[in-house]
Every structure is written in structure tokens, then in C-alpha cells.
Amino acid sequence: MLASTIPNCISYDPTFGYELAVIFRDGLRRMHEKKENIFYYITTMNENYPHPEIPKDKNCEEGILKGMYKIKEYSQYKKTKIQLLGSGAILREMIAAAEVLQKEYQIDSEIWSVTSFNELRRDGLEVERYNLLNLSLIHI
């Protein structure tokens, strides 16, 4: 959260290699091609674990860069469904917990990888500002 106090700092906490690749590619494009005055703060882990392929969802890369995307859904029972959000080191444990919830307690879930809580915050602040400046466009 400290990185949110620096306006041109883009911070990420990816879990999987494909997330890091998407972030690096976009960072190079923004800093070198577009010459944006930004820098990246990326937290990575040194734990050795299997990395899945990038999901087939067409919105996956956009979600990675915006800060959150759905990586998995358990929907066998269609009664109770919970949303699980996680990033970095805890995400893999959350996936394991979702499997336990489904197998032992019949609770379905959606698992969301949060690559950047700061980017989500920025997006929310931007929407809030737009709504304040465009009150006549808001439909209640």
C-alpha cells in the first residue's frame, strides 16, 4: 500500500510466470515505446512451484494489468458460491482451500488472482472522480 502514495509507481504482486510476462511486456511498451514517466515495483517469490499456462479467457491479459482476473471457478453444486481473492504467495494456498471447500463442504467458489491492489484502487478512484464530475450522467 505504500506504493500507492507514489503516483508514477506501478506495483504488482504476481503469482505465476505468465502474469509476470504480461506485466513485463506492458511495462516495456509503456516506458520505452510510449515514454511514460513511470516505474514498476514488482514483488516476486523464490519458492519453486508449478506454473500453469495462461488461461484461455480473452480478458485475462487485460485483467492482469488492471489488477484482478478470475483464474478458476468451482461450480458443481450451484447452491452457495463464494469469491476468493488472493495474490502472490497466498494464491496457491487459496486454490487448495477452494478444492477443500468444494470436496468436503460442497461450497462452490470463484478464485480471483489480484495482481495489483494498487491498480484496483486507482481504477476505483478514477471511477469515483468521473462520477463526481458527471453527476447528470448517473442513473439511479
Predicted regions and their residues:
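Active-site-adjacent substrate-binding region
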Residues: 16
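Thiamine diphosphate
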Residues: 1-4, 11, 19-23, 28-137
